[in-house]
Regions:
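Short alpha-helical segments that sit at the start of domains
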Residues: 2-33
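Short, cationic-aromatic polyanion-contact patches
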Residues: 24-27, 79-98
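Short acidic, hydrophobic short linear motifs in intrinsically disordered regions
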Residues: 41-49
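Short helix-coil junctions and helix-kink-helix linkers
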Residues: 48-56
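Short, hydrophobic-biased segments on the C-terminal half of alpha helices
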Residues: 62-66
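Glycine-centered, phosphate/nucleic-acid-interacting loop/turn motifs that mediate DNA/RNA or nucleotide
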Residues: 72
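Short beta-strand "wing" residues that participate in macromolecule-binding interfaces
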Residues: 76
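Amphipathic alpha-helical dimerization/coiled-coil segments
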Residues: 97-142
């Protein structure tokens, strides 16, 4: 499985949050949701969508989009005098990258307890356990075919 770049910062990991809010703030999560629904949006278009949920300053939206671009979460393209922003990764790619970073950090520091806890959690659901077994078989098959 290919790692997604950039690495997603884990400093703000929030276990009780939903979706990408585990690693992004509330505003950044809302921006990602907007851009996943429709890419290629200007600052004003993103602002209009955000204003449906909350009052927000134009400069806040502008700064947030620029910071998310610099973090590598968004791409942007100049159209006329303004930038148009898109999510750099699909929701699936972003979520996979987030999971890789979280699990990678746990495995790097707590390999045995992390694996044990993971197996315990997966083992609670027969279907999920079957999925894991199939993934392990596929990984071994691909690994063996490279030798």
């Amino acid at each position: 499985m290919q790692r997604i770049r950039p690495k997603i910062a884990l400093r703000g990991f929030k276990p009780g949050a939903d979706g990408v809010a585990h690693v992004l703030g509330e505003l950044e999560s809302a921006v990602m949701e907007i851009l996943w629904k429709q890419s290629g949006r200007s600052v004003t278009e993103v602002e209009d969508e955000l204003r449906k949920r909350r009052n927000i300053a134009h400069t806040t939206v502008l700064t947030t989009l620029d910071r998310m671009f610099r973090k590598g979460y968004l791409s942007r393209e100049k159209q006329g005098k303004a930038y148009v922003y898109s999510a750099r990764y699909s929701r699936e790619e972003f979520e996979r990258g987030m999971a890789q970073e979280v699990l990678g950090a746990l495995l790097n520091h707590y390999r045995t307890p992390a694996l044990s806890a993971f197996v315990d959690l997966v083992g609670e659901n027969e279907h999920t356990l079957d999925q894991l077994e199939a993934m392990i078989r596929e990984k071994r098959r691909r690994g063996a075919s490279r030798k």
